[in-house]
Amino acid sequence: MAHIEQGNRVLMLSYSNVSVDGAIMRVHKMKPNMKPGTLVRYGYARHKDLLEHRYLTSYNLSIHNHPELLKERQDLIAERKKLPRTSPRYVQIGRRLTQIRNELSSEEKETVKNAKFVATTVSKTVVDSAVRDCEFDVVIFDEASMAYIPQIVFAASLAKKHFVCMGDFRQLPPIVQSNGISPLNADIFQYCGITSAVDSGRNHKWLCMLDTQYRMHPRIADFASRTMYGGLLHSTEEMEKNRRGIVDQKPITGHAMAFADLSGMMSVCTKTGDNSRVNVLSALMSFSLALEAAKNHEVGIITPYHAQSRLLHAMARDVADANPELKLIACATVHQFQGSEKDVIVYDAVDCYRMPYPGMLLTSTGNSYANRLFNVALTRAKGKFIGVANIAYMDNKNLSSSLMFERMIEGQRRKPSCLTGQELSQKRTAISGSTMSFFDNDEGNRRFLKDIAEARREIRIDIPDKPVEDVFSRQLAIALQTAKGKGIKVYLRAENKQGIPSVLRPLAIENPFVANPVVLIDKKVVWFGMPSSDAKFKSEGSILQMRYRPVIRFEGAHTAASLYGFMEMSKTVDQSKIVSTDEEGKAITDTFASYVLANKKCPSCGKPMKMQKSKKGKFFLACTGYPACHETALINVDLVERYFYRHGDTGQHCTRCNCSLEAKLGQYGLYIQCCGSQRHRYKLDEI
């Protein structure tokens, strides 16, 4: 502001859109009555208030200056919707819309030339001559620790009088994939020797240290100060009073820093197809804590892994759709949260068994990488920070005592601010509502069977290990058979088909990668913990008992779609290598895949053949002796017909119209259809 008042033109650059949005909103708040066009946000804004402001963004300012173009554009779009694409008028409107877009774009560039304060990202500046060709007296580079040295040099070249780097060298470093030593690995503070000077207790002539913070509750700030800033960070006297309203409300009332310990719970961490990580129970518990806080405060959930943030974001969308009165819960990775703040932050660490070791985002000590990431997450919280992790897993992996995350665990362990698995399972019932509900076993069994009975299209069940209750297993088997009789698709995947109750085996297919007790009904209703199983963690030769098994129901199409993708629930081909048997020891051949396994032998080695599905969705036969035997074969009509008539002359019938099923060979290969008038079709993993 001082530079603007002195008549200087100022360019504010940052690495992230969130940071740029925050900077211009703060400047506008200081001088809200400035003439339109004095302050301009150029580029893609993300902040809701900024997007809705009449003239702070360059695009909105262009429309503010030329409202007639906006009206003409809206009228033309409405007219074009009613025209066929081949109409000459349709083409004419398209040309005029392009002209309007170009006129507005030119106007945006003019607003940049005339503004006193321009805020944008460094990447936008590099590619857009509208900023690059302007003259600025002062250039301020915010979040400079994230930038590469060449970007800093480029930004400095745009300043006529002053260049200021602002940032925290204890927070996010530049993102570099290579492990080699290079100037690109260092931030500007390391490159200039500022970091080494501070580490050794010396001053640096270029450094102006801002050592008073105005965001966090003092307990949060003190922990950050002790672990990352050598005790140099201080809080203003009124900060504790200002944040008391957040601390004294749920969740974990009375504590600015708290922890939710998932030890003794089946919080399974698995890798996704893009090599990220996801933990379903950890996400559910983190979200339940955030949901409790969202009744009164702005809440964010931060996680190291992109896949987990996508799952949490899907849950937030479902809750927002069902409960518009609640404040939207922001869910993102650490990098996406840089530059923003929330009243309450929930940090979901994700890592747990079955991962052999926590990922580098939690454990890397090189360049203090993990500490810098966690420091960003911690310092986003204004009043309350809640960590969520399986402490027993972290203890088992012997994390370095230099890690900020490990020091938080040690500081919270066995304190009233650290919720145990028992407290998490019981206390979550307080937030049960229309979208997310917690149940005890008996109540959960009843509601689960009710949802099965009300299913309309499909039921997908994953069972890791053996269900605990045989009585409930029989009730579930009856409910699933009834659903199949109504034409509902039922997919029951077991980690080990032979290990589940015999009443469920005829319905089951084997998939050794099933890891979570998750159910999806009609791709909308999600259950975790049903049917209740005896699943345990197996780690380094020992078996870890699970003491707490929460039963959770979540309703939301976005969440169901995310889980369907992350858990690869479309993979419904039986992976069994041995034939399952019933209580009397007879082979179960109630699916085509199990029939193939029991009756088809490899012509090369004599081992059973099994049905497989290619990446293109084509079914074929492969030897169970792979990789020793590479024998494969096509599936022919005769084999499918023999399966249909395995129990006698009546054959197999369509579950939707009760007409006979038949196998045929068409232009695109083998297909199954019924003989009824509607010709219902089935895939080989559906019969």
Locate the predicted segments by residue.
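Extended, charge-rich low-complexity interaction segments
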Residues: 65-85, 352-378, 522-525
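Conserved helicase motor core of SF1/SF2 NTP-dependent helicases
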Residues: 16, 123-438, 447-450, 454, ...
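Short, hydrophobic beta-strand segments that form beta-sheet elements in well-ordered domains
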Residues: 20, 41, 118-121, 140, ...
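Gly/Ala-rich phosphate-binding loop of Rossmann-like dinucleotide-binding domains
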Residues: 4, 28, 294, 484
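Generic beta-sheet signal
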Residues: 42, 166, 348-349, 380, ...
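PLD/PLD-like phosphodiesterase catalytic module centered on the HKD motif
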Residues: 424-617, 621-687
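Walker A/P-loop
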Residues: 1
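Conserved P-loop NTPase motor core of helicases/translocases
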Residues: 9-135, 175-187, 243, 317-320, ...
